[in-house]
């Protein structure tokens, strides 16, 4: 650019501190397809004494993470599942068909000698305590990740109910933010959590699968952009191909292309990829809400207008291109809220010949051959509506605006800093 005042030419630049996203596949390529590494303390005591220290820690509300890691390192060796097929992910062989594996087999475990920290021992600890203490030790992860005090209290109440169902003589868990909140910053603890959830997701009928109550937030952690696509798919009934056809904002298109990079096992349920963050496979998720702020905001604006509670509570993480994203979201929500895609599903047996061979979807969801661009399209086709929007200079008419306003006025009690609050205050 040239400045007329100073008669100089300048190059316009803006500061940037963004970190490139890291894909799961890159980790395994750089590490010769080795399992994620974890370091666990090797203490000069056996399982019985560790069990006593963990139970004593629960009693005294002074549980040491070192004791928990060593205890889980022992206990998880006896939690096994038999594979019905070879289990591989990113070229890593996790286990062979018909073999028994444990959660630790998902990791490359390094045991290191460590000095035993002092702790309170419970003299009445026994093997019967293992089930509830395993649940509690893993459940602390979910508790620690919950910052909202009301929700945290609810989680704790549910945890204690489950603990008592596992053992009526179990010790009720007491929240200790000073200790527990620091646990989720310990890479070895979070790697154990991820390995356990990945194992119990694979073996859904395992007797200890109930432990997923505490570990489930590890699955798809920091993948809010990607999981929001699934949310919109479920909310609207649209397939992903149709969803992306409604993307009219170029920056959102770039985000979706980046998320859909091939070779990442996104469609493989038992892959390492849902646990990439807690397993330390990526420093910055390519699927997070912050890395895909436009997509995340667009989807949850649509969801908020359609009164989805999940969308209403979604955090407002993006302020870039808000005018374009808002217009695009309003149009998509209007069409999908007011135009259904219905078909005849059941008929009487004697009438089925009237329907067999009939192409019921002949005109459903497809662009029409001709539309009057001065009127709203009579289809729910993204192509038709984009043509209408383009011919109207990308401006929504009063019919659409009034319809959206009526819906947004029904929204109540949103939390500050959420997309629901933004929709309520700007569109109602």
UniProtKB/Swiss-Prot annotation:
SUPFAM superfamilies: Rhabdovirus nucleoprotein-like
Species: Tibrogargan virus (strain CS132)
Subcellular location: Virion; Host cytoplasm
Keyword match Protease: no
Subunit structure: Homomultimerizes to form the nucleocapsid. Binds to viral genomic RNA. N in nucleocapsid binds the P protein and thereby positions the polymerase on the template. Interaction of N(0) with the P protein prevents the uncontrolled aggregation of N(0).
Primary residence: virion
Protein known as: Nucleoprotein
Pfam families associated with the record: Rhabdo_ncap (PF00945)
Gene: N
